[in-house]
């Protein structure tokens, strides 16, 4: 937009300024420089003649004004911007704001390769523990001498996807409903040996474990049971479990058969302590059920 302004005045030149209260004219200290104020403060387009009391020469000055967007007010650049520091200029503050607004630390960035690797590893580990195998710690003497306090073992979970538990399997299991009624929870995990399966008739008589009327030959127990137990028929989808330390074990002879759904897995390997590393599966597997 082009604006032509024609001003006629007497030398020495004057700058036209308007104050907030009263209009007044200020003499320009530099006669060779014409000072202009914003359009809103200029007193024009009237012709102005000033009588200074002296004989002054009169001259006419023509001015052209052009609208330049570079003159409009802009935000001040950051003090850290520019080419002096060799940076990209003006983005440092934004980076600080983004850093403060992070929900997770930079190393936990879901888009980074390292974070993805960690999360995949955790997911695989949890899946392995939930579906395949998990480590366990022995806290008591109920399975002594097979397991001592502090022994660590691996319990696998794959076998029971394809078959039902067999006699002599050492299983870890969540507390059954009868124990949860007296304060136990699913977080309470036990380890015992299966001595009878569904449909079997089990009893303890004269220091012998009897299954379907036949005494079991158990070389792995600490000592013969010192109690009597009347015959019990193991219900469907259940097993009967006992500790190898028969006289110091809180097991099925006290609280009854164990539902199969409470079984977590089967002990297959002891990896601690080093001098007792060994497998925990008896030779013959489920052959005892065929005797």
Swiss-Prot record:
One of its GO terms (molecular function) is peptidase activity. Residues 1-67 form a transit peptide. CDD domains: S26_SPase_I. InterPro entries: LexA/Signal_pep-like_sf, Pept_S26A_signal_pept_1, Pept_S26A_signal_pept_1_CS, Pept_S26A_signal_pept_1_Ser-AS, Peptidase_S26. It comes from the Eukaryota. It is an enzyme of class 3 (hydrolase). Its main location: plastid. It holds the Pfam family Peptidase_S26. Keywords: Chloroplast, Hydrolase, Membrane, Plastid, Protease, Thylakoid, Transit peptide. Disruption phenotype: Plants are albino and seedling lethal. The active site is at 142. Residues 69-96 are annotated as: Disordered. Involved in the maturation of the plastid protein translocation channel. Required for the biogenesis of plastid internal membranes. May also function as a thylakoidal processing peptidase. Belongs to the peptidase S26 family. This is Chloroplast processing peptidase. The gene is PLSP1.
């Amino acid at each position: 937009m082009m604006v032509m302004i024609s001003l006629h005045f007497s030398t020495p030149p004057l700058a036209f300024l308007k104050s907030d209260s009263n209009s007044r004219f200020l003499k320009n200290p530099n006669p060779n420089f014409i000072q202009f104020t914003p359009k809103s403060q200029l007193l024009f387009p009237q012709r102005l003649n000033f009588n200074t009391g002296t004989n002054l020469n009169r001259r006419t000055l023509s001015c052209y004004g052009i609208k330049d967007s570079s003159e409009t007010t802009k935000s001040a650049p950051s003090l850290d911007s520019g080419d002096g520091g060799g940076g990209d200029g003006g983005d440092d503050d934004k980076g600080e704001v983004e850093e403060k607004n992070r929900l997770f630390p930079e190393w936990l960035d879901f888009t980074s390769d390292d974070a993805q690797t960690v999360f995949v590893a955790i997911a695989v580990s949890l899946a392995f523990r939930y579906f395949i195998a998990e480590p366990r710690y022995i806290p008591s003497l109920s399975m002594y001498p097979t397991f001592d306090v502090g022994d660590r073992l691996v319990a696998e979970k794959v076998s029971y996807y394809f078959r039902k538990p067999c006699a002599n399997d050492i299983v870890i299991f969540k507390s059954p409903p009868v124990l949860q009624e007296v304060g136990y929870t699913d977080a309470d995990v036990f380890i015992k040996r299966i001595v009878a399966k569904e449909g079997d008739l089990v009893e303890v008589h004269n220091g012998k474990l009897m299954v379907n009327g036949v005494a079991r030959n158990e070389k792995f127990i600490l000592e013969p049971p010192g109690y009597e137990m009347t015959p019990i028929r193991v219900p469907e989808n259940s097993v009967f479990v006992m500790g190898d330390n028969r006289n110091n074990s809180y097991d099925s002879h006290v609280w009854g058969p164990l539902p199969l759904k409470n079984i977590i897995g089967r002990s297959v390997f002891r990896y601690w302590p080093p001098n007792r590393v060994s497998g925990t599966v008896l030779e013959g597997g489920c052959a005892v059920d065929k005797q």
